[in-house]
Structure formats: C-alpha cells, structure tokens
Swiss-Prot record:
Protein name: cAMP-dependent protein kinase, catalytic subunit-like
Family matches, as InterPro entries: Kinase-like_dom_sf, Prot_kinase_dom, Protein_kinase_ATP_BS, Ser/Thr_kinase_AS
SMART domains, A to Z: S_TKc (SM00220)
Residues involved in ATP binding: 69-77, 92
SUPFAM superfamilies: Protein kinase-like (PK-like)
EC assignment: 2.7.11.11
Protein kinase domain span: 63-317
Amino acid sequence: MSSSTSSVESVEDESCSNECSASFTFDTNNNSRGDQQVDELAEETHMKLSITPTRESFSLSQLERIVTIGKGTFGRVELARDKISGAHYALKVLNIRRVVDMRQTQHVHNEKRVLLQLKHPFIVKMYASEKDSNNLYMIMEFVPGGEMFSYLRASRSFSNSMARFYASEIVCALEYIHSLGIVYRDLKPENLMLSKEGHIKMADFGFAKELRDRTYTICGTPDYLAPESLARTGHNKGVDWWALGILIYEMMVGKPPFRGKTTAEIYDSIIEHKLKFPRSFNLAAKDLVKKLLEVDRTQRIGCMKNGTQDVKDHKWFEKVNWDDTLHLRVEVKKLIGIFLIPIFQPPIVPTLYHPGDTGNFDDYEEDTTGGPLCSQRERDLFAEW
C-alpha cells in the first residue's frame, strides 16, 4: 500500500475498482547499521529470517502489532508477530467506514476472495482474515525486502539483465493468475515486493477481478493504463500485458514511456502513443516492449492464440530457463579471485539483519485511533468477512 504513485478508478461501477550479469545488495534507506561484526551476524542469520507460518487459524489477540510499514487511502499495513510461534506477518488493516465512503466494498471482497485461491512463489500469501467492530484485517505473508520501487528509485534504472530477471518472474505470475481467469489490473513497481532472497512477490490485489469476458470501468494507475481502459471499450487480461510493457520500459529507463504533468496529460500521451526509446535501450527488449504496447489488443503479444507462450518465446527471453525461473533457481557467475564461480542469487538481495527487520520500508506515523467508527449498516456489508 504505497502512496508513491496514486491509483485511479471509475466510481460509476464499484465492481472495478534467470540470467543476470551482476549481484547487488541495497539498503534503500541508506542507514548505517553497524560494524563488521553486525555484517557477519547478518550473513549467518540470513537464511533464518523467516519462520514458516504453521497456524491454520489466527486470532488478533495472538498477534503483537509492531509498526506500520505501508499506508493507503483507507487502510494501512503493519508488521505483526505471532506471540506463540514468533512468526512475522503483514497485517493489512482496513477501516470499514473509509472503505464504504471510498466505494471500495466490492474491491475489498474481491481482494480477499482472489488472494485466498492463489498459491504461487511470486505472489504474496494470504493466511486468514479477521474483523472487529470498526476494521477488517487480512493476515498476510511478510515480505521483508520492501517495494521494487525503492530499489529502482535508488539505482535510477536497472540493467537489461536485471529487468529481464524480474520480468521473467512477473510473466510466470501473470500466466498463473490468467489461467485462473483473474486479471490483476495494477501492475507497477510499488506493488512488487522483494522476498528476503530477492525474488518478486506481487502484492495488493485490490483491483484484481475474476473475468469471464470483459469489464468496462477504469482501474489502475494512470501511467500504466491501457488504451482500451481509457476508451471504455471493455478490457480483459490484455491490460496486464500492456502494463508489463510499461514496467519493462520503466525498469530500464527509470520512468514510464507515457508521461505528463497532470493525469489528463498522461492519458493524452497514452492515446497519442508517442513511444520513444533511448539509444541505449536493448534492441530485443525494445521489440518486446513495442509488442506489449500494441494499441490493438487483438494483436498484442500475450493476447493472441498462443497466449503467454508467445511472450516466453520472445527473443529477449531466449536465455531464460522457465522451469528454473518458476523453481527459483538462479545461476550467476561471480568473480572470486581469478575464478568465475557459479552462485545462486537474484540480482538484488535485500539488506536484512534480523527477523522482522523493517529497514527496507519507509517510516509512517502510527495511527492510535483505529480510524472512524462505523455504523451497523456498514458492518453488515462485511457480515461474511
């Protein structure tokens, strides 16, 4: 739940709302975390940072709520710790009155329903839901690496091989959710988290929707909206492939291809489709981005007869072993002395020093009020929560 880039939606219909050349470790807050002894301790404990959750049911009373790690228009995400097992979770807290006032009731129900059926290595897990008299709670996997947006902002842009690594994991995730008839509709760096090992975790499924055919309302972030969404001619999974094209471009350039000072100017830029690439942009990547940003969705790569396979078969991904990608096998060669030693490590490994480390998240003011009180009528909208 990032406030870095705003998402938009139409209020007319509430139903919407493995190759890498180098390895880097980022501390996105640029904090000094201690001396060499601390670094050595981090090295030793790196593989022990997450306690795998084993509880099939949760009670809020069993969770110690520690600190806010994300904030949105009608809710926040907090780090929480199970007092019994010691496991850490991300606790999404949604104020019922704010959800209703923002006409997000159906979105919230959609997110819960979608997340509970998703089980994939590149998608954040949801374990349980709870509610009290004023708030809804979603108990989710804590992904300690923070947002991809933070790393992209710190480095300004990613190399061709880094962008390909992350894009390949996103392709696998999109293939999976599309196979279930689900459209994501909010792909952007702020919604992509990094696991402690450095793999992608897609988060925030508030705009996700199960689709049989098309939906017609505008959902998503202005920079990432597809032309058919703006034209209200109906959209489907093609909007996710369009967004992937925007994301690849932004990863490699540092900013999205269609820009403007206002939302209206961004929309005009998308409709005019003046797509320009820096000279340094990899040619194979350029070809893929052009095919993903095809205005005619029937001719857009990923949307034709062969679906995702066309994307996987594109020449930009020719060095990707898709089975290795899906099973988190990443081989890179690191120069140690005079030898190139194969190691298994994503291009960015988050800086972490202990279980529950929140150093890769921004600081937020804590909310001690619990949000505005809600009425019984508003509570009844979530009677089955």
